Regions:
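Thiamine diphosphate
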Residues: 1-178
Length: 178
């Protein structure tokens, strides 16, 4: 079987404020936003995706800077209709985020496939997916197969805990094994 390799990517300095307490979810968003501001090799290789939880898992600033992927350019309907929003959903061919809708199984299938890019095509992609941690179980078959194939990706389960009041009871982590 043919396998390719790609060089290790250098990681640029990431300035993380440590002078105050911050949630891991907010820190994750700040790290990606810091990377999105630059033009490092790492930042150009990151691909993010989520099953309809982009804003609530702190990917919003990354997506605003790096745009959403689409085969052809599409305008942001909220901007066109003058609907107030912190999201700037511009779809462009060079976009680095793929929005999946509510589809956790598709999230893990995509992460697994993109996580094999270095060995299949000789070019590394750094796939990062976010999901509400209580819904990870919806994609475990695909996650298992991706791991068997030695796919390289990052899955961020957030927000965790049992105090996510605005999201409702169905989004709590009470079923997550500890």
């Amino acid at each position: 079987m043919r396998r390719y390799f790609d060089a290790t990517l250098p990681v640029p300095r990431i300035d993380i404020p440590t002078n105050s307490q911050i949630s891991t979810q907010a820190a994750f968003g700040k790290i990606l936003d810091d990377l999105a501001k630059g033009d490092s090799d790492l930042a150009t290789r990151i691909m993010t995706t989520s099953p309809d939880v982009t804003g609530t898992t702190s990917l919003g600033p990354w997506v605003n800077r790096r745009k959403l992927f689409a085969r052809t350019e599409k305008a942001d309907a909220f901007i066109e209709q003058r609907i107030p929003s912190t999201a700037k959903w511009n779809f462009v061919p060079e976009g680095q985020h793929l929005e999946l809708g509510i589809a956790e199984m598709n999230l893990f299938l995509l992460l697994g496939a993109a996580g094999l890019s270095h060995s299949l095509f000789g070019k590394r992609i750094i796939p990062i997916g976010t999901v509400y941690d209580t819904f990870v179980h919806r994609g475990l078959d695909a996650l298992n197969y991706a791991c068997y194939q030695d796919a390289r990706f990052m899955i961020v389960g957030t927000p965790s805990g049992v105090t996510l009041a605005p999201e409702g009871g169905a989004h709590q982590s009470i079923a997550t094994p500890l």
